[in-house]
Design a protein with these regions (language model features):
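Short, charged, amphipathic alpha-helices and their helix-cap/turn boundaries
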Residues: 130-134
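An aromatic/glycine/proline-enriched structural segment found at the starts
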Residues: 115, 152-219, 383-398
């Protein structure tokens, strides 16, 4: 459940890192020894809608590794030296955002688009929130997590179910939960309006530019989301063949929609070298997609070879399915997807519904959503470049 605020950004991620790396009953040396001898690992991931702690172990070692996993979840230790090492890593990550032009651009875009929105909070520590990530606050956050009982246990593999149930009952089963009902935040979509381009300056972007065009896109629970994902994959190939291969505008272009409750879509150019014509060539590529023309290649005489969305649709569907669902072939991958389903959708089988929608998506749906979101929706430009570079954003420039 979305609990983070801008002031507590990074708190949950930091807590879960301690839960993955420490526990009361098992020293660091003992945990490392068990991990090495059993070829197992404990990790975590954090989203704005929730976090997950996971154990990856062979079935035959489950009875040896589960106690380590549960003790980390229930009894993480917050030793001062480990805390200081963690905080140093957080400070380095924050500095890394500002040192890298592309990361700083993405950070700025997120801050601008989510100002005053629940997603103004971040899963990672920020310059404004890091001072709040104290040992005391981490302990309190952990207590709240256990008291609310707002978590689920997901298991996959050929394991001894009697042992699992007995172990869970003797640990998590002894927790006393509060009667307070936890509700999910009502996360509203964001609105993006056409405005003057935002251009940042960075010494490491001297002689090049990173340019992003953003627009509002559908939430990952809406019917238009899957067609938009496929549209982005197809359009990325058109951008590559037009913007990079034909005109040599940049090193790499791409387009995609973010999967969340309040997302936005992106057209991004990585390492731009032509500062005057990038907008014009992007518009050309956009027009081809809107008119159902996939650019396959550029001929020797400079002309294009085209195909249609319908002609290529099955290939794009299969590619997306393989990239997204191939991890289900392992128990660890399956648990990861099931956990994500619960965190993001509160529905453990949601990926199966999306898989069916992928199979049913038509070329007409893809073209419709592309025109609606990429072409007709208002968009905003953001860029980062060197101190003296002038970027031509075309007709949108004010």
């Amino acid at each position: 459940v979305e609990k983070l605020t801008p002031e507590t950004s990074g708190m949950e991620t930091t807590l879960f890192s301690f839960m993955a790396d420490s526990s009361k009953k098992f020293s660091y040396k003992k945990r490392t020894e068990i991990s090495y001898n059993t070829n197992s690992s404990i990790g975590y991931f954090s989203k704005l809608s929730g976090s997950a702690l996971y154990l990856n172990a062979m079935d035959k070692h489950f009875e040896k590794t589960l106690p380590v996993f549960l003790d980390g979840f229930l009894n993480p230790t917050f030793k001062q030296d480990e805390y200081e090492n963690t905080m140093n890593s957080l400070r380095q990550r924050i500095q890394g955002i500002f040192n890298d032009p592309e990361s700083f651009l993405a950070y700025t875009i997120s801050n601008e688009l989510y100002k005053g929105h629940p997603y103004e909070a971040k899963t990672f520590a920020t310059p404004d929130s890091i001072k709040n990530i104290t040992i005391e606050n981490l302990k309190n956050y952990h207590k709240e997590l256990l008291a609310n009982g707002n978590f689920s246990v997901v298991v996959s593999g050929k394991i001894n179910s009697d042992f699992l149930i007995k172990k869970l009952n003797s640990t998590i089963g002894k927790l006393k939960f509060s009667n307070e009902e936890t509700t999910r935040k009502n996360v509203q979509p964001i609105s993006i309006q056409k405005n003057a381009p935002v251009t940042l300056r960075h010494s490491s972007a001297e002689g090049t530019a990173y340019i992003t065009k953003v627009f509002a896109s559908p939430a990952n629970t809406e019917p238009d989301f899957i067609p938009c994902v496929l549209a982005g994959n197809i359009y990325t190939d058109i951008l590559f063949n037009v913007v990079r291969e034909h005109y040599g505008i940049c090193y790499s272009p791409q387009s995609y929609v973010i999967g969340s409750k309040a997302p936005y879509g992106i057209e991004h150019l990585f390492k731009v070298s032509d500062f005057s014509n990038f907008e014009k060539t992007m518009k050309e590529a956009r027009n081809y997609m809107a008119n159902d023309k996939i650019v396959e290649k550029t001929n020797a005489d400079g002309s294009y070879e085209f195909s249609t969305v319908e002609q290529n649709l099955e290939g794009y569907k299969n590619s997306y399915i393989n990239q997204t669902y191939q991890s289900q072939q392992t128990s660890a991958g399956l648990v990861s997807i099931l956990g994500y389903n619960l965190i993001q959708f509160n529905d453990i089988d949601y990926d199966l519904k999306q898989l069916e929608q992928i199979k049913q998506t038509t070329a007409q749906e893809i073209l419709r959503v592309f025109k609606k979101y990429w072409v007709e929706n208002p968009s905003a430009w953001f860029a980062i470049t060197g101190e003296n570079t002038t970027l031509n954003f075309g007709e949108q420039e004010q």
